[in-house]
C-alpha cells in the first residue's frame, strides 16, 4: 500500500483570500491548453491574431466552467442543489461534470465558429488535442481533494484517502484517469493530428477514446453516493454518459473517412 500524500487543499492563503488547488488546477489546464494552441495556430488559422486566440480560450473556458458545474448539478445531485442553490457557486468544494463541460464547450465553440467564419467541426478538430491537458490537471485536483476515489483493493499501489469514512485501501482512480484521460489521450491525439486528417476525424477520435477510457475506469471507481449504480449492478452515470460518446465518436470517424473517399473520386 502507498501512503496518500497529505496535501493542504488550499494552495495559497493571503489573509481571508484562499486559492484552492482544485481551482488552481483548472487555471493550469486552461493556461497549458492556451500555450499549446498558440503553437498550433499557424497551421489552423494563420490569419488569426493572438487576441482572436484569446477570445477562443475565453469562450472555451466559459463552456468548461459553466457547463461543468451545471452538468454536475443536473446529472449527479439535482435535489441537493435545489434544496440549497448557494452550493452551485461553491466550485472549490468539487462537483464538476466532464460531460456537462463538454456540452458547454460545444455550445460556446459553435457560437465562436459562427462569429468567426470557421466550420464547427474544423474548430473542434483544433480544440480536441488541447482538452487532455485540462482533463489531466483536473484529475490531479480531484486527487489533492481526496475525492472520486476507487473501490477497495489489495493492490500494492492502493491508498487510504482521508475523506473515506471506512478508511480502506482503495484504487487511486483519479490517477488512473490522469494517466488515461490526460497523458494517453493527449499522446494519441497529438500524434494523430500531426498529419492532415479529414474534418471531424480528430474530434471523433477524442470522443471515442475518452468514452472508452472513462468507461473502463468507472469499473474501479466508487459511484456517486446519491446515485449508486443505475442498472445491472455495475452501470454508473459516467458510463451511461460515455456510451453516446463512444458510438458517436466511432460514427464521426467513419463518416469523415467515407466523405474523404467520396471526394477523392
UniProtKB/Swiss-Prot annotation:
Q: Name one GO biological process term.
A: lipoprotein biosynthetic process
Q: Which domain of life is it from?
A: Bacteria
Q: Where are the transmembrane segments?
A: 10-30, 56-76, 87-107, 117-137, 172-192, 200-220, 227-247
Annotated Gene Ontology cellular component terms: plasma membrane
Q: Which residues does the annotation say bind a 1,2-diacyl-sn-glycero-3-phospho-(1'-sn-glycerol)? A: 139
Q: List the Pfam families hit by this protein, alphabetically.
A: LGT
Q: Name one GO molecular function term.
A: phosphatidylglycerol-prolipoprotein diacylglyceryl transferase activity
- Stated EC number for the protein is 2.5.1.145
Pathway-wise, it operates in: Protein modification; lipoprotein biosynthesis (diacylglyceryl transfer)
UniProt subcellular location? Cell inner membrane
| Principal localisation | membrane
- What is the enzyme's main class? transferase
* UniProt keyword list: Cell inner membrane, Cell membrane, Membrane, Transferase, Transmembrane, Transmembrane helix
- Membrane topology category: Multi-pass membrane protein
As for what it does, the entry says: Catalyzes the transfer of the diacylglyceryl group from phosphatidylglycerol to the sulfhydryl group of the N-terminal cysteine of a prolipoprotein, the first step in the formation of mature lipoproteins.
Which HAMAP family does the record associate with it?
Answer: Lgt
The UniProt entry, under PANTHER family, shows: PHOSPHATIDYLGLYCEROL--PROLIPOPROTEIN DIACYLGLYCERYL TRANSFERASE, PROLIPOPROTEIN DIACYLGLYCERYL TRANSFERASE
- Say which family it is in: Belongs to the Lgt family.
Q: What is the protein name stated in its UniProt record?
A: Phosphatidylglycerol--prolipoprotein diacylglyceryl transferase
**UniProt gene name:** lgt
Amino acid at each position: 500500500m502507498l501512503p496518500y500524500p497529505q496535501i493542504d487543499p488550499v494552495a495559497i492563503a493571503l489573509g481571508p483570500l484562499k486559492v484552492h488547488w482544485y481551482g488552481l488546477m483548472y487555471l493550469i489546464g486552461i493556461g497549458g491548453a492556451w500555450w499549446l494552441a498558440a503553437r498550433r495556430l499557424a497551421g489552423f488559422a494563420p490569419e488569426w491574431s493572438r487576441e482572436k486566440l484569446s477570445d477562443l480560450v475565453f469562450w472555451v473556458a466559459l463552456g468548461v466552467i459553466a457547463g461543468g458545474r451545471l452538468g454536475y448539478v443536473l446529472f449527479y445531485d439535482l435535489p441537493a442543489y435545489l434544496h440549497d442553490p448557494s452550493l452551485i457557486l461553491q466550485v472549490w468544494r468539487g462537483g464538476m461534470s466532464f460531460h456537462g463541460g463538454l456540452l458547454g464547450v460545444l455550445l460556446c465553440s459553435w457560437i465562436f465558429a459562427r462569429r468567426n467564419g470557421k466550420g464547427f467541426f474544423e474548430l473542434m478538430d483544433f480544440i480536441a488535442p488541447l482538452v487532455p491537458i485540462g482533463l489531466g490537471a483536473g484529475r490531479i485536483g480531484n486527487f489533492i481533494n481526496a475525492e472520486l476515489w476507487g473501490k477497495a483493493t489489495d493492490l500494492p499501489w492502493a491508498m487510504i484517502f482521508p475523506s473515506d469514512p471506512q478508511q480502506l485501501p482503495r484504487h487511486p482512480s483519479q490517477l488512473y484517469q490522469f494517466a488515461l484521460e490526460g497523458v494517453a489521450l493527449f499522446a494519441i491525439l497529438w500524434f494523430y493530428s500531426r498529419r492532415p486528417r479529414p474534418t471531424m476525424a480528430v474530434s471523433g477520435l477524442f470522443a471515442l477514446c475518452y468514452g472508452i477510457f472513462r468507461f473502463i475506469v468507472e469499473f474501479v471507481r466508487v459511484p456517486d453516493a446519491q446515485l449508486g449504480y443505475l442498472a445491472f449492478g455495475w452501470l454508473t452515470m459516467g458510463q451511461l454518459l460515455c456510451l453516446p460518446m463512444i458510438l458517436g465518436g466511432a460514427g464521426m470517424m467513419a463518416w469523415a473517412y467515407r466523405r474523404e473517399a467520396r471526394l477523392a473520386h
